[in-house]
Every structure is written in structure tokens, then in C-alpha cells.
UniProtKB/Swiss-Prot annotation:
GO-annotated molecular function: DNA binding; DNA-directed RNA polymerase activity; zinc ion binding
Organism encoding this protein: Carica papaya (Papaya)
Annotated keywords: Chloroplast, DNA-directed RNA polymerase, Metal-binding, Nucleotidyltransferase, Plastid, Transcription, Transferase, Zinc
GO CC field: chloroplast; DNA-directed RNA polymerase complex; mitochondrion
Name listed for the protein in its UniProt record: DNA-directed RNA polymerase subunit beta''
Principal cellular location given in the protein's record: plastid
Family: Belongs to the RNA polymerase beta' chain family. RpoC2 subfamily.
Top-level taxon in the UniProt lineage: Eukaryota
Role this protein plays: DNA-dependent RNA polymerase catalyzes the transcription of DNA into RNA using the four ribonucleoside triphosphates as substrates.
Location within or outside the cell: Plastid, Chloroplast
Catalytic reaction list: RNA(n) + a ribonucleoside 5'-triphosphate = RNA(n+1) + diphosphate
Cofactor(s) required, per the database record: Zn(2+)
């Protein structure tokens, strides 16, 4: 009784793990028999209490969490705001998906954490609570689904469905929720059936690998150890203790001068506590990895036997124990978890919160603005940033680590606990990322615009795939395509006034407009619209409107002045220079179109690239038709791969290079009608001219009708030509689809006269028996092998320096036999003449691979000229000159302060009159005299150059002006290339407001604005805008780009712009809900078409946001239909942590399969190590150390990975079991081919120790590298063929062994079992008999020590105050990567 009084009384909840510990202590102290008696009493007590409680479970026991309602409401509110942002174009689809998933994930997690406290407070004896938290049935996440919310589910592909299931199973699901939740339900049912067999097979393979490992010696004499440090923060204390208990020290441990533990001493709980309290230096322990033999293990490297708490006995079959103990919990592991699905784990970042209210300050030069992955604006800091928060009485300093996002602005007031920064999740956490492509489809049809320069993807110069350089909007301007031929095109927008006559406009009026076909963008110019009144368009010149059909962007200019010239239109990186004067234009209605110069984005031309092209008007067709090649050898320029890869992308245009002389064009009339339209003619019928085809379309030619149904439309073709019903004797009936040259044809015996032109013969079979032949007229085009350059350019152009050459090459734009389709009555260009740039390589001095081109703007004496300059570059050097600040030759508007305002981020240099100093040819693009206008090439490298600001003196000025006025657009181009235009009568009632309103009013006072403008006769136009003669009775011309010059009437200016900062400009894109006037209406999103004194006309458009690196499909100005792919985003998402979990994960690690294509593949890491170390250390040492290091590294990481999976499921396995198995996987090396040795064959797998020993014995380097074998491969690569054959592939293994004459020494357990011998383990182990005296003395010592260590432990039998054995593994454990072994300590 006296003894009992000394015992400490404990009163706490005890769970499974704690009971295990209790039992092991009891056995240590009292022995087996006594312990079993105690446990019987515990069992009886347990059943008795359970009977008395009588737990039953009903639906009423499922109590919903009260806070759920407002949590869900809050999340819905956030999603709604997000949806709005997406609609306004502030956030793109990927950001929206990410954010909504994180919103719901956080809500669901929060509910889950609320659940436990809620039960504890309201109903601690709730059966659901008791069951799940005692571990009897169900786990937290299942209970969460019953009483919280089911949360996010994943679809069968493992992708998230961003519609969360808000209800729980207690409330019941709606139909949609039920269907979504069925995706994941199947897995749970299948799991249980499959799980047992999987776990069994895993156990079998594990045992197979390690069955021969038996404890054969007491000490192998190794001096190695693996060091573990108690100071290491990455490892929780509990895991540290688990790692140490039961191990044997590899080295003495000193505390200052005093030795507190000696080598080969095994570690008990007392020693561990001492280590922790003393915070000793790193502790070196022996593990199965350090044991010096491969086929067995020694007692000291293994440590204590878990069964009876003593050093393991000799002859113990520890291999099989290890295999069993890893395989057995496999049945408890889930195969997959079905509750969270593929949540973006690792997606939520850590936050830094503000410690108190106050103003926040930081150095703005250390951060730069960016977007977070949710599309919010933020600052990114590269280095540690110290942030000061000043509250009234105290100043806080917060340091923000590098690569974090700062979510607040400088000098902003922050509340206490407000999130001020987001720390990027560290890269060390092994979140496997995968790259996902997401396509965004357009939901309306219309014309595509983008508000930034979109770069071409370099490989596909001729395709329509573009890469975005920076964040910008893509706009789909609404408007359908109406392809009728009677109504030429609808010139009317909603609410335009309209004359009744205008519908019956004759087609000539349109053909008389000069047409310029610039890649699907058709601009119609006419020199003077008022002349055309006779033609029946009476009303447009009176309207002062810009008429813009939604789809085709036909732009009309009303009453331009006679002397104004239409100048270089600029489109992304292409210029068109008109070549003839206006007088010519009036004589010849179809003018020659301009030469377009194409410059790549970076301005670098490779050899043989196309510099410019010219569309010859002789190869223009009005009608649709089919193109056939004659004697042309054509080869496609676009490589095959490009075409194949982008087959999904629409409208891929190939160019064919022409070798020879002629091709043919077979005209036909084509109408593309919507599906619903009723067609009044039958297929294969013959109609005359002007027949009604549908309600409002009449045919223009007579002939045969073919009707073809396409996906969303009907294509109706009318073939003109003669129809012949051939007799039986006619040979022509056999020819179908051939061209017949003139002079040969006998189409009919009656008409034997010779044909004048080529004809095309086509055989048509309306029914099976009848057929006839259609003879169609053909237009023949001859192609000169190269137009003489002199016809295109003046001769003085070619003063070639550095052997620059230009060749003229013709390209056919359509393939052989391809149908050529025109939209409306625009003409179609069949052949394009290109200038190909080349240069000589002969000079050794000019080993030039590429040339640089720039558009250069020169202003001389208030005249501004543009030049194209080509530089031969040898190196990538980039010289830029800083222009002089005070430049006397500044023209009026561009005063020396104003010049850098026009395009704030690029500066121009001025060349004064002293042009003669520069060598090289300079020719102006636009001479003022109308006769000669020429293209310029400067080919000297000592000219001048424009570059973006890097270190320019007035950098700060611009920075400040940006702060004052955020309206400045930052252009991403090679600098402003503008054109000069003469202005006749400039009225002074206009204000000319540039981008930067503030700076204008600062530099030119408004009162003297008027006279400035009267003086100037020329002024600069920005590259993106054009200002034409702005007198009030003419229209303001719409340009598809933002006009950077705003014309506002005086009163209009007051109404709108003083109150708000928004200035409406023509062509500007406006997002939805931008407030223009103080109490004006909220606008829909769109493009401003017309600005009048009191009104604005906006064409509706839908913005899509795209971030850098996204791929844009389609061309600028191209017509897109509903459902076409607009953009493809490539984004990284973390692999959801629980798609492969549990068993499959363990199996993946043990079989060494790569986890994902972009995983941190261990084998690759291993190879890298080997190569690097060999390079550093030379051959023999390199291989030895390289293989050693790799193996050590990969072993530690494998053990950690496997432990992580088991711990996350709450299963405790001792590290040493996993170590024994990992040791077998990593114990082989692969002989490599370098430095062939005579001993082993290349590609042979040998044991690491054997390789080392052989290397030492031969004194010759054996080249090998470490390799990870999976458990299956390791079982088939053992020393015993009998064991291999009994595992898998019996016939193959036995046949090979017979061929090689292998000998099996019957060392393992399995071979002996198969052959019925004595098993070499336990009592059958021979070594048990000879047990030397030295060993016995060691045994006795260790026994004594153990007794000493265990003595004082009964008093804290329910564990000391640290609650070491806290069974409930915290959630965090799942996420922290435990580095159980810190390094290799080779003492």
C-alpha cells in the first residue's frame, strides 16, 4: 500500500498511440505475464463503460455549424465581385478560376476548423464527435462533409470544378450538386475492394527485396554516422525523439569538456531528454545505411528491437519484419482521397499582417509594380525590404523577404491586422507543379483588336499565332459578317439616319474607291467624296459621321482637301507607303498599292528574310474562284511542322514561292449564307443572270449552281461557262478537272473552230447515269520572273554599302487548286512581290549573321522625315546617344520640353542641318514634290540610333509626370514614327490636348495656344494616330487605333473634363461602368466612334484580359465567330496534394517512378550530381565520391517521402524499417562505358561495395554511376536466382541462370524455404553457437545501462510534461517537409 501512495495520479484522455507506449513501458518494468493481466482489466473496463454509455447514432446528432450561413454568404459575395471584375476585363479567366477556388477552399477549411470547438462546446458527448475523434469510425473530413459543407470537387480528370457544393449531406444536395458529387463518389466504393489486394502485393514485393537481411554480427566496425541536430528548426521535437529512441550512437557526445554519452551506446528516453535540454551539437547515430555489408546487418547499426526494447538479437530476420511493417498499414491507407479532390494545395500563400494602425512607408526604388496571380495590383520586391509603419506613438519595422508581393502603396494608411504582403510559398516545399493550357473562347462574333503591340511567335512568322509582351486587353468589336452581294455592305449603325435610295447603290460606286487590301483590313479611300454625289450616295457628306460596319471596318473620309495626301498607315510592324500622287489616282481608279515594309519585332533580319512586299494590281481579282498552277514549280515556305502543330488554329496562310511563268484563275460566284436561309434554287440546276437565289440576293452571272452545307453556313457556288452533253465517242468525257490550252480543243464535232483562250473542263454527275461537261472560262496570268527593281524604286537607292543586296521574289498567296474567297467585293491579291534582303559573306571582315533595322525620324528645320535604316551587326552592342536638351531647331509644337512628352518612354534624336557629316545614304520616304516618292535604306553602321531610355538625364522628369497623370500610355515600340502633313486652315476654337494634360498646360499657357497653332504648318503625328485637317464642317476621321490627339470643343471641354479625369478620344476603348460625366449614364464597354458636342457614339465591344506570355490566335482586325479560340494561357498550378496519396504514392516512391513529367525526378538529380562531381574531382575519385554522395542524398529524401505519406495518414512506422528497404533499392551501381574496365561489362548492375572493393584491388578506375532500382527490379537483381525465379518471370530467370551457369549459395531465407533447407535465421542461425567473450561483455554492459535508464521512469509512465507522444498528428505536419536526416557525418 505504501508503494501505491507514491505513484503519481494521472487524469487525461488516452488514445491508441499512448496505450502502445504504456504497454511497452509495462513490459520493460514488470514482464510479460503481469502486463497481460493489467491489460485484461483495461479491456473489461472499456467494454463495461461502452455498454453503460450505449452510443447510438441518429440523424439528429448531426449538428450543423451555426456560422456556416454567413461564411457561405461572404464567399458568395466575393465570387460575385470577382465575376464583375472578369466581366469588366480586369481579371482574366485563369486568375478568376484560381481566386474562386481559393475563396471556397478557405471557406471550407475554416468551417472544418470551427467544427471541433463547436461540438466541444455544444455537445461534448455527441456520438459523431466521439466516434470520429476517438478514431473509431470516420475522420475529420468525413464529418466535415456531414455537418459542414462538401466543398470543392474534382472532375474525373482531376481538374477542379469551380462550382463548390455548398450544402452538406445532412441538409441534402440539390440536383446539380448531387451530380457533381457523384464524380468523386465512385472512387470511394472501388477503393475498399482494390485496396486489400494492392496492399498485399506491395507487402509481397517489399518482403522479396529484403528477405535475406538477417542480423549476423554484433558490430560491423563502421565509423560513419548520420547526424541529427536538436537545434534544427525544420524538424518538430516529437519526430526528433522518434528518430533517436532505440538508435545507437556512432560517436561520443560531449557537453563542453564532459562526455555525456559514448560511442555504441543505445539511446533511451532519458538520454534524448538530456540532449534536448542541453541543446547539444549534432548527434551522430548509426542507421542501417551506415552498415558496411549489403547482404546482412549488424546489431549496433540496427539498434533496439521494437518488440522487447533491447538490442536486437543475433539471427533476427529484420528484413522480413521491415517489409511486413511497411506493408501492413497499407490496408489502412487510402488509395485516393475523394473529399478535397484536386484543390490547389500550396496555392495559398503566407501573409504578413500589419502590427498596428498607421501609415506605411517603404523605399519605392526597391520594388516594381506587377500583378499577383489573382490579378490584383501589387509590388514585387527583389531583396529584403524593410517597411516602416508609423502609428501615433510607436514605429514598427517589418522586414519582408525577397520575391514577396507588397499589397499596399507607399504612404497608405493601414489598419491593424490588415494583410500588407504575401510571401511566395518557398520553393523548397516539393510542390510538384504542372503546366496547364487554358483556352479562352470568344462568346460573341466580331472583329478583333488589341491594345498593345502583339509580338509574333518567332517560329510562325507566317501564321496567326502571336505572343503578348505585356498585360493588355483584347477587344472583340461586335458586328456580324453579312456576306450578301446585293446590298454591298450595310453602312449603317444603330440609330443612323438613312436614305431609302442608299440601298440601291450601284456597285460601281464601290469599285471606284481605291482598295487597299492589307491582311483582312479593308480601307476604302477616295480622293474626294463630294464628287460621287451623282453615283447615288447623297447623304453621307451631310451627316458628318463616321460610318463603320461592325465587321469590316470600312472607313469613309468625307471632303478631304485636295492637297492632303493619305500617308503611311502603320499596323503593328508594317508600313505602307503610297507610291503615286493624287492626280494619278483620279485618272486610274485602281491605284497601285503601296509597298509595305515589314520589320520584325526586335528589328533584326536574318539572311534571306522578306524586307518589304508590293501587291501588283495586275494580279488582282474581284471575284472568288479557284487557282490552278500551270508550269510552276512551287515550294511552300512554311515548314511542314508549323502547319501540323497549329492545325487547330484557324486560317493558316501559306505562301508559295514561284519559280516560273503562268498560273490560271477560274472565276466563280460564291455566296456564303447562314444555315437558316431559304434557298430558291436547286443543287445542280442552271440559272440565268439576275436570278433570285434567296429573298434578297440575286445572281450576277448565269451558270450551274452547286450547294454545299458547311458547319454553320451554306456555301452556294455559281459556275459560269458552257455546258456540253458529250457523245459516247468523245474523249473529253474522261478528262475532268483539267485545263486545255488554246488551239487544241474539240469540244464538239460540230464546232471545230479553234479556241482563243484556255478553258477548264469539269465533269459533273447530277445522277448516276447522266453526266455532262462544264467548260469554264479561265483567266491566265503570266508572271515575269522578277519585276525590274527600277520600276519600283528610284535608281539612286542602291548605293550599297557592305554588299547589301535586294532580290525581288514573287509569291503566290494561294495553293494549287485552292478556292480563293473574297469578302464582299473587295479585290483579292493573287501574287505578292517581295523584296528579299541578302548580303555577301565573302568579306572576312563582315561575318555578319543578322542586320538591324530601325525606322528613324529626322526633323530638319521643322520638317520631319522618316527613314528606314539597316545596320549590319556583328555583335549585340547597342549604342545610344542622348540628344541635346536645348535644340534650336525644335519645331513649334515639339518645343524642347514637349518633344519627350509625345511618346514618353522613347526619345528622338534630332539631326540638324549637318547631315553631310554622316556617311551612308539617306533618302526621304516622303518627298514634298509629288512625282518621286521613294523607299530608303541606310546601310552604314555609323549613323545614329534610337534606343529606349536607360540612363537618360531627364528620366526623373518623366517619372514625376507619370505620377501626376497616369493617363500616359506607355508604348512598346521602336520609337515614334510619324508623318508630316500640311494643314491648310486650322481653326483656333480647338484645344489640342496631348496625352499629358498637365504638362501641356504647364509648358504652353492656354492663352497663347491659338497663335502657336496658326504659326505651325506641320506638326508631328504619333505612330498610332492621325490628325487630318480639322475644320468643323468636315468629319473627324476615325482611326482604328487610339488617337492620341483629342479634339474637344470649348463647351464640351468644360462639361466633361473639368469634373472628371476621363477624356474621351476617338477610337478609344472604354471599359464598362467608366463614369464620363459627373452625373452621366454608365456606359457599356466599347470603342468611341463619334464624338460630338453633346454626345458620344460607342460601338459595343467585349474586353478580354490577357497577361504576358499568353498566345493570341488570329490577326488584328480579323473577323472571329462565336466559339473561336481567342487566347491560350499557360499557367502553372501546383499538383493537388491528394490526387496520388496513400498507397499509390508509397508505391510510386518505392518503384522509383517519376511522379510527373515536371517533377523533381530523383534519377535526373542523381545523374546531375554524378556528372558535376566527376568533372570537379577527376575520374576515380569522382565516381567513388559522386556515387556515394548521390546515394546518401537520395536515400534520405526517399525515407522522408515515404514517412510523409504514412504520417499524413496518422500511421507511425519506425524509420529503420524504411531504411532497410531503401538501402536495398539504392545499393546497386551501373557500370558506365567511359574508361572500359576488363572486369565488368558496361550496363551491368553491381553492388556499390563490390565496385569499390574491385576498384581498390585492381588499382584501376571503374566508371560507374549510382542508380535507383524500383523494388520489383531490385528483387530481380539479387544474388540468388532461386529467389528471383520464385518471385516473377520464372522461366526467363531460370533460363538465363542456366546459360550463365550461376551458382546460388543459398544465403537468404526464401531459397532455403523453396529447397526445404534449414532457414538461416533465429535458432537456425549458425553464428549463435560461436559467441565470443567480448561480445557477451558488451551485451552485459548495454543491459546494465538500459536498466539504469529505465529506473526512474515509472513516475512519468503517462509521459513527461512535453506530451511527447501526442497521437493526433497536426495538420501542419503534412505540409512541412521533414528533414529527418540532416547530412552525412563522415567522422
Amino acid at each position: 500500500m505504501a508503494e501505491r501512495a507514491n505513484l503519481v495520479f494521472h487524469n487525461k484522455v488516452i488514445d491508441g498511440t499512448a496505450i502502445k507506449r504504456l504497454i511497452s513501458r509495462l513490459i520493460d518494468r514488470f514482464g510479460m505475464a503481469y502486463t497481460s493481466h493489467i491489460l485484461d482489466q483495461v479491456k473489461t473496463l472499456g467494454f463495461q463503460q461502452a455498454t453503460a454509455t450505449s452510443i447510438s447514432l441518429g440523424i439528429d446528432d448531426l449538428l450543423t455549424i451555426p456560422s456556416k450561413g454567413w461564411l457561405v454568404q461572404d464567399a458568395e459575395q466575393q465570387s460575385l465581385i470577382l465575376e464583375k471584375h472578369h466581366h469588366y476585363g480586369n481579371v482574366h479567366a485563369v486568375e478568376k478560376l484560381r481566386q474562386s477556388i481559393e475563396i471556397w477552399y478557405a471557406t471550407s477549411e475554416y468551417l472544418r476548423q470551427e467544427m471541433n470547438p463547436n461540438f466541444r462546446v455544444t455537445d461534448p458527448f455527441n456520438p459523431v464527435h466521439i466516434m470520429s475523434f476517438s478514431g473509431a469510425r470516420g475522420n475529420a473530413s468525413q464529418v466535415h462533409q456531414l455537418v459542414g459543407m462538401r466543398g470543392l470537387m474534382s472532375d474525373p480528370q482531376g481538374q477542379m470544378i469551380d462550382l463548390p457544393i455548398q450544402s452538406n449531406l445532412r441538409e441534402g444536395l440539390s440536383l446539380t450538386e448531387y451530380i457533381i458529387s457523384c464524380y468523386g463518389a465512385r472512387k470511394g466504393v472501388v477503393d475498399t475492394a482494390v485496396r486489400t489486394s494492392d496492399a498485399g502485393y506491395l507487402t509481397r514485393r517489399l518482403v522479396e527485396v529484403v528477405q535475406h537481411i538477417v542480423v549476423r554480427r554484433t558490430d560491423c566496425g563502421t565509423i560513419r554516422g548520420i547526424s541529427v541536430s536538436p537545434k534544427n528548426r525544420t524538424m518538430p521535437e516529437r519526430i526528433f525523439i522518434q528518430t533517436l529512441i532505440g538508435r545507437v550512437l556512432a560517436d561520443d557526445i560531449y557537453m563542453g569538456p564532459r562526455c555525456i554519452a559514448i560511442r555504441n551506446q543505445d539511446i533511451g528516453i532519458g538520454l534524448v531528454n538530456r540532449f534536448i535540454t542541453f541543446r547539444t551539437q549534432s548527434i551522430s547515430i548509426r542507421t542501417p545505411f551506415t552498415c558496411r555489408s549489403t547482404s546482412w546487418i549488424c546489431r549496433l547499426c540496427y539498434g533496439r528491437s521494437p518488440t522487447h526494447g533491447d538490442l536486437v538479437e543475433l539471427g533476427e530476420a529484420v528484413g522480413i519484419i521491415a517489409g511486413q511493417s511497411i506493408g501492413e498499414p497499407g490496408t489502412q491507407l487510402t488509395l485516393r482521397t475523394f473529399h478535397t479532390g484536386g484543390v490547389f494545395t500550396g496555392g495559398t500563400a503566407e501573409h504578413v499582417r500589419s502590427p498596428s494602425n498607421g501609415k506605411i512607408k517603404f523605399n519605392e526604388d526597391l520594388v516594381h509594380p506587377t500583378r499577383t496571380r489573382h490579378g490584383h495590383p501589387a509590388f514585387l520586391c527583389y531583396i529584403d525590404l524593410s517597411v516602416v509603419i508609423e502609428s501615433e506613438d510607436i514605429i514598427h519595422n517589418v522586414t519582408i523577404p525577397p520575391k514577396s508581393f507588397l499589397l499596399v502603396q507607399n504612404d497608405q494608411y493601414v489598419e491593424s491586422e490588415q494583410v500588407i504582403a504575401e510571401i511566395r510559398a518557398g520553393t523548397y516545399t516539393l510542390n510538384y507543379k504542372e503546366r496547364v493550357r487554358k483556352h479562352i473562347y470568344s462568346n460573341s462574333e466580331g472583329e478583333m483588336h488589341w491594345s498593345t503591340d502583339v509580338y509574333h511567335a518567332p517560329e510562325f512568322t507566317y501564321s496567326n499565332v502571336h505572343l503578348l509582351p505585356k498585360t493588355s486587353h483584347l477587344w472583340i468589336l461586335s458586328g456580324g459578317s453579312s456576306r450578301s452581294s446585293l446590298v454591298p455592305f450595310s453602312l449603317h449603325k444603330d440609330q443612323d439616319q438613312m436614305n431609302i435610295h442608299s440601298l440601291s447603290v450601284e456597285q460601281e460606286s464601290i469599285s471606284s474607291l481605291a482598295v487597299n487590301n492589307d491582311q483582312g483590313r479593308h480601307k476604302f479611300f477616295s480622293s474626294n467624296f463630294s464628287d460621287k454625289k451623282k453615283c447615288g450616295i447623297p447623304d453621307y457628306s451631310e451627316f458628318h459621321r463616321i460610318l463603320d460596319t461592325g465587321h469590316c471596318n470600312l472607313i469613309y473620309f468625307a471632303s478631304l482637301h485636295e492637297n492632303s495626301d493619305l500617308l503611311a498607315k502603320r499596323r503593328r510592324n508594317r508600313f505602307i507607303i503610297p507610291f503615286q500622287s493624287i492626280q494619278e489616282q483620279e485618272k486610274e481608279l485602281m491605284p497601285r498599292s503601296g509597298i509595305s515594309i515589314e520589320i520584325p519585332i526586335n528589328g533584326i533580319f536574318r539572311r534571306n528574310s522578306i524586307l518589304a512586299f508590293f501587291d501588283d494590281p495586275r494580279y488582282r481579282r474581284k471575284s472568288s474562284g479557284i487557282l490552278k498552277y500551270g508550269t510552276i514549280g512551287a515550294h511552300s515556305i512554311v515548314k511542314k511542322e508549323d502547319v501540323i502543330e497549329y492545325r487547330g488554329v484557324k486560317k493558316f496562310k501559306t505562301k508559295y514561292q514561284m519559280k516560273v511563268d503562268r498560273f490560271f484563275f477560274i472565276p466563280e460566284e460564291v455566296h456564303i449564307l447562314p444555315e437558316s436561309s431559304s434557298i430558291m434554287v436547286r443543287n445542280n440546276s442552271i440559272i440565268g443572270v439576275d436570278t433570285r437565289i434567296t429573298l434578297n440576293i440575286r445572281s450576277q452571272v448565269g451558270g450551274l449552281v452547286r450547294v454545299e452545307r458547311k458547319k454553320k453556313s451554306i456555301e452556294l457556288q455559281i459556275f459560269s461557262g458552257d455546258i456540253h452533253f458529250p457523245g459516247k465517242t468523245d474523249k473529253i468525257s474522261r478528262h475532268s478537272g483539267i485545263l486545255i490550252p488554246p488551239g487544241r480543243g474539240k469540244t464538239n464535232s460540230k464546232e471545230s473552230k479553234k479556241l482563243k483562250n484556255w478553258i477548264y473542263v469539269q465533269r459533273i454527275t447530277p445522277t448516276k447515269k447522266k453526266y455532262f461537261v462544264l467548260v469554264r472560262p479561265v483567266a491566265t496570268y503570266e508572271i515575269a520572273d522578277g519585276i525590274n527593281l527600277a520600276t519600283l524604286f528610284p535608281q539612286d537607292l542602291f548605293r550599297e554599302k557592305d554588299n547589301m543586296q535586294l532580290r525581288v521574289v514573287n509569291y503566290i498567296l494561294y495553293g494549287n487548286g485552292k478556292p480563293v474567297r473574297g469578302i464582299f467585293d473587295t479585290s483579292i491579291q493573287l501574287v505578292r512581290t517581295c523584296l528579299v534582303l541578302n548580303w555577301d559573306q565573302d568579306n572576312k571582315s563582315s561575318s555578319v549573321e543578322e542586320v538591324r533595322t530601325f525606322f528613324v525620324e529626322v526633323s530638319t528645320n521643322s520638317l520631319i522625315r522618316d527613314f528606314l535604316r539597316i545596320d549590319l551587326v556583328k555583335s549585340q552592342s547597342h549604342i545610344s546617344y542622348i540628344r541635346k536638351r536645348n535644340d534650336p531647331s525644335g519645331s513649334g509644337l515639339i518645343s524642347d520640353n514637349g518633344s519627350d512628352r509625345i511618346n514618353p518612354f522613347y526619345y528622338k534624336e534630332r539631326i540638324q542641318q549637318s547631315l553631310s557629316k554622316n556617311h551612308g545614304t539617306i533618302r526621304t520616304l516622303l518627298n514634298r514634290n509629288k512625282e518621286c516618292q521613294s523607299l530608303i535604306i541606310l546601310s552604314s553602321s555609323n549613323c545614329f540610333q534610337m534606343g529606349p531610355f536607360n540612363h537618360v538625364k531627364y528620366h526623373n522628369v518623366i517619372k514625376q509626370s507619370i505620377k501626376k497623370d497616369p493617363l500616359i500610355p506607355i508604348r512598346n515600340s521602336l520609337g515614334p514614327v510619324g508623318t508630316a502633313i500640311q494643314i491648310a486652315n486650322f481653326y483656333s476654337i480647338y484645344h489640342l490636348i496631348t496625352h499629358n494634360q498637365i504638362s501641356v498646360t504647364k509648358y504652353f499657357q492656354l492663352d497663347n495656344l491659338n497663335q502657336i497653332f496658326e504659326v505651325i504648318k506641320y506638326y508631328l503625328m504619333d505612330e498610332t494616330g492621325r490628325v487630318y485637317n480639322p475644320d468643323p464642317c468636315s468629319n473627324i476621321i476615325l482611326n482604328p487605333f487610339n488617337l492620341n490627339w483629342y479634339f474637344l470643343y470649348q463647351n464640351y471641354h468644360h462639361n466633361y473634363c473639368e469634373e472628371t479625369s476621363t477624356i474621351i478620344s476617338l477610337g478609344q476603348f472604354i471599359c464598362e461602368n467608366v463614369c464620363l460625366a459627373k452625373n452621366g449614364p454608365h456606359l457599356k464597354s466599347g470603342q468611341v466612334l463619334i464624338v460630338q458636342v453633346d454626345s458620344v457614339v460607342i460601338r459595343s465591344a467585349k474586353p478580354y484580359l490577357a497577361t504576358p506570355g499568353a498566345t493570341v490566335h488570329g490577326h488584328y482586325g480579323e473577323i472571329l465567330y462565336e466559339g473561336d479560340t481567342l487566347v491560350t494561357f499557360i499557367y502553372e498550378k501546383s499538383r493537388s496534394g491528394d490526387i496520388t496519396q496513400g498507397l499509390p504514392k508509397v508505391e510510386q516512391v518505392l518503384e522509383v517512378r517519376s511522379i510527373d513529367s515536371i517533377s523533381l525526378n530523383l534519377e535526373k538529380r542523381v545523374e546531375g550530381w554524378n556528372k558535376r562531381i566527376t568533372r570537379i574531382l577527376g575520374i576515380p575519385w569522382g565516381f567513388l565520391i559522386g556515387a556515394e554522395l548521390t546515394i546518401v542524398q537520395s536515400r534520405i529524401s526517399l525515407v522522408n517521402k515515404i514517412q510523409k505519406v504514412y504520417r499524413s495518414q496518422g500511421v507511425q512506422i519506425h524509420n529503420r524499417h524504411i531504411e532497410i528497404i531503401v538501402r536495398q533499392i539504392t545499393s546497386k551501381v551501373l557500370v558506365s562505358e567511359e574508361g572500359m574496365s576488363n572486369v565488368f561489362l558496361p550496363g551491368e548492375l553491381i553492388g556499390l561495395l563490390r565496385a569499390e572493393r574491385t576498384g581498390r584491388a585492381l588499382e584501376e578506375a571503374i566508371c560507374y554511376r549510382a542508380i535507383l532500382l524500383g523494388i520489383t527490379r531490385a528483387s530481380l537483381n539479387t544474388q540468388s536466382f532461386i529467389s528471383e525465379a520464385s518471385f516473377q518471370e520464372t522461366a526467363r530467370v531460370l533460363a538465363k541462370a542456366a546459360l550463365r551457369g550461376r551458382i546460388d549459395w543459398l544465403k537468404g531465407l526464401k531459397e532455403n524455404v523453396v529447397l526445404g533447407g534449414m532457414i538461416p535465421a533465429g535458432t537456425g542461425f549458425k553464428g549463435l553457437v560461436h559467441c565470443s567473450r567480448q561480445h557477451t561483455s558488451i551485451l552485459l554492459e548495454t543491459k546494465k545501462k538500459n536498466l539504469y535508464l529505465f529506473e526512474g521512469e515509472m513516475r512519468d509512465i503517462f509521459f513527461h510534461h512535453r506530451e511527447l507522444f501526442d497521437s493526433c498528428i497536426s495538420k501542419n505536419l503534412h505540409n512541412t517537409s521533414e528533414r529527418s536526416f540532416i547530412g552525412l557525418n563522415d567522422s
